[in-house]
């Protein structure tokens, strides 16, 4: 993105809340009514074509449970407990959301040199407007000021990056890293034998310490992969170099 296109931070929260559905940008369309109709039609028409569901309310509850976990490690057992159906059913339903482009399963980065990496994927909602409607965050202001603002911010950034690859006809070469010591890197983009580490922070005061986990990447063999400078995507309104190999970028650069 170019400097003149940067959005003010409050506009980002409007976009996060509004979501991606083009019709929502027509002034006459009510956000709440639109998403209620969208979910109802999606389950009645699309889901029922793909699988047998006994209860629309169960599937709606499932979508709410997934939306509430956007950006978290996918724990099928926990979701099954919330919804009151079997783990196998949750796995099947998650596959349907994937096929429909409603969620994305972000795989953990795998490399023999990073021994402690966990192997569970994370799940992300690809439309933060739908995520907000399902979890009843009804205005941009409540999202921005609420306890889940980091979750919405991260989901928005990840979905924007995923869509940018899709728009170029590419399968996103993106991963995350977390290990058994709770060290984590939000996103790793592996492209042309180069790793691009990204941290996503809702803060407007980015610091070098926020990217400390990037040091783990030095364990990777330099003859196989090169490590690009790290990036912290955040709410500070300008591009800011925090170190020679670390830049903080405004979310509006996406």
Pin down the residues of each PLM region.
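Switch/connector loops and helix/strand junctions flanking conserved nucleotide-binding motifs
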Residues: 133, 207-209, 239-243
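Mg2+/Mn2+-dependent nuclease catalytic core
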Residues: 203-220
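Active-site ExK catalytic segment of metal-dependent nucleases
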Residues: 190, 195-206
């Amino acid at each position: 993105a170019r400097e003149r296109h940067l959005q003010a931070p409050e506009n980002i929260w409007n976009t996060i809340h509004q979501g991606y559905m083009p019709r929502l940008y027509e002034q006459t369309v009510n956000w709440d009514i639109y998403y209620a109709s969208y979910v109802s039609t999606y389950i009645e028409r699309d889901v029922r074509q793909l699988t047998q569901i006994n209860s629309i309310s169960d599937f709606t509850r499932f979508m709410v449970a997934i939306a509430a976990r956007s950006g978290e490690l996918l724990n099928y057992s926990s979701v099954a407990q919330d919804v009151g159906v079997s783990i196998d059913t949750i796995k099947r339903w998650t596959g349907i959301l994937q096929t429909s482009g409603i969620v994305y399963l972000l795989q953990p980065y795998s490399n023999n040199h990073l021994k402690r990496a966990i192997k569970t994927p994370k799940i992300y909602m690809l439309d933060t407007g739908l995520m907000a409607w399902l979890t009843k965050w009804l205005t941009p202001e409540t999202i921005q000021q609420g306890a889940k603002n980091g979750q919405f911010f991260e989901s928005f950034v990840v979905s924007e990056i995923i869509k940018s690859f899709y728009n170029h006809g590419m399968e996103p070469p993106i991963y995350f890293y977390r290990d058994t010591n709770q060290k984590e890197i939000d996103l790793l983009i592996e492209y042309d034998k180069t790793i691009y580490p990204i941290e996503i922070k809702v803060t407007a005061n980015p610091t070098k310490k926020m990217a400390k986990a990037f040091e783990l990447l030095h364990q990777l063999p330099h003859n196989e992969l090169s490590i690009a400078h790290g990036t912290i995507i955040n709410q500070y309104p300008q591009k800011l170099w925090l170190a020679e190999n670390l830049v903080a970028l405004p979310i509006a650069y996406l």
